Amino acid sequence: MINLRQQMPHYLRLMRFDKPVGIFLLLWPTLWAVWIAAKGAPSFKIAVIFIAGSVVMRAAGCIVNDFADRHLDKHVQRTQMRPLASGSVSVTEAMLLFAVLSLIAFTLVLLLNRLTVELAVIGILLALVYPFLKRFTHLPQLWLGVAFSWSIPMAFAATVGHVPAVAWLLFFAAVLWPIVYDTQYAMIDREDDVKVGIKSTAILFGRYDRLMIGLLQGSVLLTFGLLGWYLRFNYWFYLGLLVALGLMCYQQFLIRHRKPPDCFAAFRNNNWVGFFIFLGILLTHRN
């Protein structure tokens, strides 16, 4: 028998509820899309469904990731004490928890229209495949960007019944952003990853990592600027982008020596990038 009271702290760690920054990194693109699709006035129902769905799917994604990496995590100092790698949670427990979370997510999406449900199926497949890609390609961060941003076409489908061109422009910007912060994150484990055969953009970029991150950051802001021009957003949106630019410059300062604690700080700082872009979107629809 599973002792839920005893195991609950381990389950929460498995779902990364002890590290909520990941929830927000998934949530910000969702909120960008929900607010833009609804022209600043989303329905309460859609907002709640997408917020709850982001939290649930992030937790489910963490379980899949740890299941895929459970044998590799034992050899990486930062991850060797994760619940599945350390044995504090069994594979059976993890799969049961994943099934419960998937059922919750499926129930939520059934409250939306058919197109959104169809897109959700694709989103689930994207999330399931991602953890296994790091064994075969140096671009798992690109797939992560697609998976993390798939809520954008879903939000437009749920709100307006189709996915317009502007949704794909927002999607493009959102896909590039996780490549930025997950490359910063991968810089932490680069030496260990090389030893165990894990691939990442941090390894692919090598000594050009800061340059490539900078180019990606610039591309994110440029695409958002184009989006703002196309939608005729006011100065509040561009002020939000200006703050985001300042934060990205600070991230470049943090990773200048490529020290793991500083790379992790840069990764976490992206939460504020997402927040200020959302704040700009929120305020541009209030004025």
Swiss-Prot record:
CDD domains listed in its UniProt record: PT_UbiA_COQ2
Subcellular location: Cell inner membrane
Annotated TM spans: 21-41, 44-64, 91-111, 112-132, 139-159, 160-180, 211-231, 235-255, 263-283
Keywords: Cell inner membrane, Cell membrane, Magnesium, Membrane, Transferase, Transmembrane, Transmembrane helix, Ubiquinone biosynthesis
Pathway(s) per entry: Cofactor biosynthesis; ubiquinone biosynthesis
Alphabetical list of InterPro entries matching this protein: HB_polyprenyltransferase-like, Prenyltransferase, UbiA_prenyltransferase, UbiA_prenylTrfase_CS, UbiA_sf
GO biological process: ubiquinone biosynthetic process
Statement: the UniProt record of this protein carries the keyword Endoplasmic reticulum: no
Record's catalysed reaction(s): all-trans-octaprenyl diphosphate + 4-hydroxybenzoate = 4-hydroxy-3-(all-trans-octaprenyl)benzoate + diphosphate
UniProt membrane topology term: Multi-pass membrane protein
Class in the EC hierarchy, top level: transferase
Keyword Magnesium attached: yes
UniProt EC number: 2.5.1.39
Organism domain of life: Bacteria
Entry GO MF terms: 4-hydroxybenzoate polyprenyltransferase activity
Record-level GO cellular component terms: plasma membrane
Cofactor(s) demanded: Mg(2+)
HAMAP family attached to this UniProt entry: UbiA (MF_01635)
UniProt record similarity statement: Belongs to the UbiA prenyltransferase family.
Record NCBIfam families: ubiA_proteo
Function: Catalyzes the prenylation of para-hydroxybenzoate (PHB) with an all-trans polyprenyl group. Mediates the second step in the final reaction sequence of ubiquinone-8 (UQ-8) biosynthesis, which is the condensation of the polyisoprenoid side chain with PHB, generating the first membrane-bound Q intermediate 3-octaprenyl-4-hydroxybenzoate.
Stated name of the protein: 4-hydroxybenzoate octaprenyltransferase
Natural source organism: Coxiella burnetii (strain RSA 331 / Henzerling II)
Protein's gene: ubiA
